[in-house]
Amino acid sequence: MSMIDVVASALRVGQALRRGRLPRPLGAAAGLLLDRALGEPPDAVHPVAVFGRLMTGVERNRYAERRGAGVAHAAVGTGIGLGAGMALGSTTLAVGLAVAGRGLAHAAEQIGAALQAGDLDLARSLLPSLVGRDPAGLDAAELARAVVESVAENTVDAVVAPALWGALAGAPGALG
């Protein structure tokens, strides 16, 4: 099956979901398969990256050390996600775009291969793709631990949460 066939199938599932013919959990499962088949889109159009850029702009223009400002910031962020989900309308595509399982696995595999080859410098240079900690002083065991911890945390944030919320609330849940 080619990538075009996979995308066409995902679009058909998404259209069927909009017509109410398939349950949302099936759309979420199809979205997971879409991520597995195609991986993440480029950062220029990846919804998480776009959302991050939007919210950075909102924060830059409206930042204040007050509870009301924080509530407004959270409300704007939630509104953007929910609005994008409602506009997209397809649970399959929303979950497929929001999930980052394939990229997460690829990054972990690259670091694992570097560790198995004994190339600590390469493993250290790759670690920031998974985690924000400074890898400079980490030995092989600490690098491996950082990968396991990061994969565990990011699996919840970047795979389980969008799929679960997509299954429960459709596209707005996956992106909101």
Language model region names:
Residues 1-176:
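Short amphipathic, positively biased membrane-proximal segments
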